[in-house]
Amino acid sequence: MAINTQDSTCLPLQEKIVHNNKTARAVELVILAFLVSMLIYRVVSFKDQEHSLPWFLALLCELWFTFIWILTVCIKWNQCSTKTYPDRLLKRLNEFEFPTIDIFVTTADPILEPCIITMNTILSLLAVDYPADKLALYLSDDACSPLIYYSLVETTMFAKLWVPFCKKYNIQVRAPFRYFTSKSSRFKDVSLEFQHEWKTMKNEYDDLYNKIEVASQRPFTFTCDHNSDFADFCDVNRSDHLAIIKVISESTGLPHVIYISREKNSQHHHHYKAGAMNVLTRVSGVMTNAPLMLNVDCDMYANNPQVFLHAMCIVFGHKNDQDWGFFEFPQAFYDGLKDDPFGNQLDNLYYVENGIAALQGPFYGGSNCFHRRKVIYGLSPNDKIKNGSIGNEDLHKVFGNSHEMRESAAQILSGSNAKIENQKSLSSLIEAAIHVAGCTYDYGTDWGKKVNVY
């Protein structure tokens, strides 16, 4: 007897699942019938009314209500979601075939956005199940705070212990502040080796937490020594300072970690997060130039270690890369109240996004989003640029006067970046990165107009 089996190479990496909502559709059709009947009655009975003006106003209101209702039904009519299969991805592709990804984490105030929360977000991203040499993490500090820089340095040192621990024991929650307070971290049917390493890791994290807390309460810890690592932060005004870029980790078994504080000048508008994202795009283009970019808010940790593999299912699951420009993961909130009485868990938003996904695609929510760099650079799905056909004059007008920026943009737009490996160390590219992080770099270019995230 023959056994019917399916080759894993033939199975889809991702598929769109249409939700069954026949009952909801039937209800909507009944409501539509009532609305149409009411409008017909208003129109037919209009001449027989003594109070024609109120009747006419009521008709206008009901027409407007019906119009809004129809728009709402268009979203509710088709509901779909995307299901991905990372296990099939791992069987089909080798790790060296995965694309490189630049990760952007943005923060603007160490008081309003506590450093320990930002560092937990970073740790969860450094520990994802993805080849470390394919990742580069950029932290944008719009406060130009030595506290944030100090926290990032200490966190990177802790990550050298935390990341191997997570991967060795397949830890599912890789933000330490959530892991060590969750029931999943409790000892139950585990080895003595795990218990010992767990306690060691807990002590190391507590030490990191205490260092950051002490530093945040005692700013004088950062002495203004021009020979120290904090020399660039001496006498800095957060709203008026030169760009600071530091490579904290490079080729150490972890993803690259780069600290960025873009140049600010009181005479030039910095455009808040939009400006920070454009600087991150330029600096990463000069330094690592990954074809994919992920932007994450500082308080949005990765709650699934395979999140990048799920993302790659969408990347490789489409026959044509022109089918998508960006995709994002929904935001979820921990420690919410049961049944969400205040509606702050955004459950309704998920429902709306499922409906929009069935029409064309979700709107950009501002975080947890993977972007194709060439799309951010202004290349529309129908544009085809052959290698060598991009004029240097055009690149100068669009991307600015940085030779390194123009060269990296040409690689991305021509599609040749996947074949060209950057042989330079990141430290040797800091000068070029500082240049593109200037507050006036985008003047006279398409940055913020045709070339931008926001």
Locate predicted features.
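Glycosyltransferases that elongate glycans
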Residues: 1-454
